Amino acid sequence: MWDETVAGPKPEHGLGRLRNKITTQPLDIKGVGEGSSSKTVAAVAGSPGTPTTPGSARKENVWRSVFHPGSNIATRGMGTNLFDKPSHPNSPTVYDWLYSDDTRSKHR
């Protein structure tokens, strides 16, 4: 599926030809320095190189907290202290609040 509004007319053969072209467009810079000037900027189609990272640095497992929420000792009891225990003896629990008549979803 090709969207002509966003991408323009569909190419006849393939996108490989489009990637190899170098496009130049004039860039007008006005009000910078003395007077106005026009410069041409060449944009090369393609992707930039991948930055290198040091191999000796150990990466932290970013998914640890998602798949093992209780693995962080500093935040282990945070959820139970905040959400599972009511702050006042007569205050509703999360379940009571979600399914009470006032706050329950009317969509059926």
Swiss-Prot record:
A GO-annotated cellular component: endoplasmic reticulum
Under what conditions is it induced? Circadian-regulation. Down-regulated in axillary buds within 24 hours after decapitation and then up-regulated. Down-regulated by the transcription factor ERF114. Down-regulated by heat. Up-regulated by salt, cold and dark growth conditions.
What tissue specificity is annotated for this entry?
A: Expressed mainly in the low bolt.
Q: Which UniProt keywords apply?
A: Developmental protein, Phosphoprotein
Q: Where are the Phosphothreonine modifications? A: T50
> For the region Disordered, what residue ranges are annotated?
28-59
Q: Which domain of life is it from?
A: Eukaryota
Question: What does the UniProt entry report for the null mutant?
Answer: No visible phenotype. Drm1 and drmh1 double mutants have no visible phenotype.
Gene Ontology biological process terms from the UniProt entry: response to bacterium
Similarity comment: family membership: Belongs to the DRM1/ARP family.
Recorded hits in PANTHER family, A to Z, give: DORMANCY-ASSOCIATED PROTEIN 1, DORMANCY-ASSOCIATED PROTEIN HOMOLOG 1
Indicate what this protein is called per its UniProt record.
Dormancy-associated protein homolog 1
High-level lineage: Eukaryota, Viridiplantae, Streptophyta, Embryophyta, Tracheophyta
